[in-house]
Amino acid sequence: MNGRYSPTRQDFKTGAKPWSILALIVAAMIFAFMAVASWQDNATTQAILSQLRSINADSASLQRDVLRAHTGTVANYRPIISRLGALRKNLEDLKQLFRQSHIVSESNAAQLLRQLEVSLNSADAAVAAFGAQNVRLQDSLASFTRALSSLPGKASTDQTLEKPTELASMMLQFLRQPSPAISFEISLELERLQKQRGLDEAPVRILAREGPIILSLLPQVKDLVNMIQTSDTAEIAEMLQRECLEVYSLKNVEERSARIFLGSASVGLCLYIITLVYRLRKKTDWLARRLDYEELIKEIGVCFEGEAATTSSAQAALRIIQRFFDADTCALALVDHDRRWAVETFGAKHPKPVWDDSVLREIVSRTKADERATVFRIISSKKIVHLPLEIPGLSILLAHKSTDKLIAVCSLGYQSYRPRPCQGEIQLLELATACLCHYIDVRRKQTQCDVLARRLEHAQRLEAVGTLAGGIAHEFNNILGSILGHAELAQNSVSRTSVTRRYIDYIISSGDRAMLIIDQILTLSRKQERMIKPFSVSELVTEIAPLLRMALPPNIELSFRFDQMQSVIEGSPLELQQVLINICKNASQAMTANGQIDIIISQAFLPVKKILAHGVMPPGDYVLLSISDNGGGIPEAVLPHIFEPFFTTRARNGGTGLGLASVHGHISAFAGYIDVSSTVGHGTRFDIYLPPSSKEPVNPDSFFGRNKAPRGNGEIVALVEPDDLLREAYEDKIAALGYEPVGFRTFNEIRDWISKGNEADLVMVDQASLPEDQSPNSVDLVLKTASIIIGGNDLKMTLSREDVTRDLYLPKPISSRTMAHAILTKIKT
């Protein structure tokens, strides 16, 4: 029994449904997909950044190309136009990307984009103006340079305008750094040239025409170049790029947080789903366990359906419980609520377990403290149940109140370690135990009803037979009275030597026998109220042992052997005493020489019903009283008729045929059975099966009357008992009976005491204290005094009238009255 999950009632009310688990799975998948999916359009963002970088590059290239075109290094304006086209395309692409991206709606990106567009438009206009004016400027410069170079003398210049003339120098200086002063000087110089004579008019006209154009266009071109060079397009593009990166970074942080949240939610939902599935699986397992438990209850009920004995049914049921809880052993004890001792014990295996009394007392005390509680403990198996082959390990012990008078204690033993079972498993064990106890109680009540029914049937039959026999017996008594009266008169009227006198004597003798038979019939027909009480068969036999001895001839030896188990039955000890006397007398009458009669008391278990000569004995537990002899035996033809009234094989020797008939009647009154087995020439055995009782046995004195125990006159009684407590108890009993007790621990101590000249009137020796080489029958020879041997319940006690002065055996426990009669008998003899 492991630690299984046991859902509570609330778990079943709030448990997840399959559709809810499916919904949670879908939600977890959605959250997981959202956690791993891309939220931002990374491709768009990267394209925006790429376009911004292209704008930066194209803007720088445009400024370079404009500068080169301004200096005249490049005469082709196609690169400038292509750069402008690229910038316009980049701007349009950027607008399209911004419309696709959510960044436009965030922060200052849209405003920066508009500023970039304005900047590009301004640059575009400046480049267009630059292109037109720079072409004209370059043409004017070329014409001006050619005209200036064609002038002779000091004013002439070469193709590179590097001739050291004043006009060329001033123009070159103006080209480098335009200023109004230089422009004014150049204008004066041009006017001077126009007024100068002797110069070629065509170059002078060209200089006069192109010079002012250069002076007016060059500052404008310079301004346009400066405007293009100082354009904020690249700066705005970089600002927009930084803004995009910042927004992108913030969005990444938010996205990462959202991803973490969604991932965590997905993982949490997955864990919750796993928990729900686990609990659902556990609840399913628990429901399956409950179904198995229902099958267990059915199987336990099946065990009690047949005619099997209660012990066999309980044993089969315990095996089912043991298998259900995966245990190695299983035992059940029904403990008396008040006396705290096991009334009945059952085990999954045979023989029955022997429970530790201290454990039972402790658990009964715990159960009585709170009658509503179930006591549950886990302790060592060796501390609970003692078996021939003990199971090492731990045992689960469960106790609860079964009835008003009984407490059920169930033990499950395990060879290996097992975790503490859950509350649900404990409840199942309690319910299974309660179910088993219920069936045992029902079977017990059925058995009691059957016993009462048999007793009632027997009583009614006896009443009917007794009424008939009583009427007949009274009529025969009257007839016999007349016959015997007249026979006695006739006897007195004839002489002693007469043959008639002898015939009359035969008539009187036969009449006396008839009177004896009629007396027995009248005894059977008397309506006496039976006293039914629980009593111990062993104690009864111990009490009547001297009476049995006196009722038998001196050539017959009696031996007794008692089992250690309880032998309590319900009925009248007087009837059982009559049964023993009748059977023992019949056995002694079947012996011609020295004979032996053995009386054995034990417990018997009948697994199946048994067919007897006089009925069918059902299975179950019984107290077995066996009486066997070594006589001549009973012939097979006679055996079926021995319990019939008036059947006898000793009609000529005074047999009435009512002795065994009364035995059968008494045993039927006990609701018992008799099984007789006999072998001619070897002896006969009477096995009397009596139903046991779980009640506390009463003292036999309550039936036989408490006679005053005989007292002594200070005689010395030596006692050998190794148990200190038991020796003190015996000494107190002996002193209370009027004797002087002298106690010894060992047999050697009393032998040394006697060897020193001390004498005792009687010696009582516990058989356990005898040396191994010392026979109990030779104790009185060693100690040279009368002795009584005290033994256990399994002591073989021999009583022989010839040997009564030599040995006497008393089985434990010994009552004060039995001890008093035994001591008095030995001292007197």
UniProtKB/Swiss-Prot annotation:
It is a multi-pass membrane protein. The chain crosses the membrane at residues 19-39, 260-280. It catalyses: ATP + protein L-histidine = ADP + protein N-phospho-L-histidine. SMART domains: HATPase_c (SM00387), HisKA (SM00388). The modification 4-aspartylphosphate is found at D766. It holds the Pfam family DAHL. One of its GO terms (cellular component) is plasma membrane. Residues 716-827 form the Response regulatory domain. Its main location: membrane. It is found in: Cell membrane. InterPro entries: DAHL, HATPase_C_sf, His_kinase_dom, HisK_dim/P_dom, HisK_dim/P_sf, Sig_transdc_His_kin-like_C, Sig_transdc_resp-reg_receiver. The modification Phosphohistidine is found at H474. The keyword Membrane applies. Activates VirG, by phosphorylating it, in the presence of acetosyringone or hydroxysyringone. This is Wide host range VirA protein. It comes from Agrobacterium tumefaciens (strain 15955).
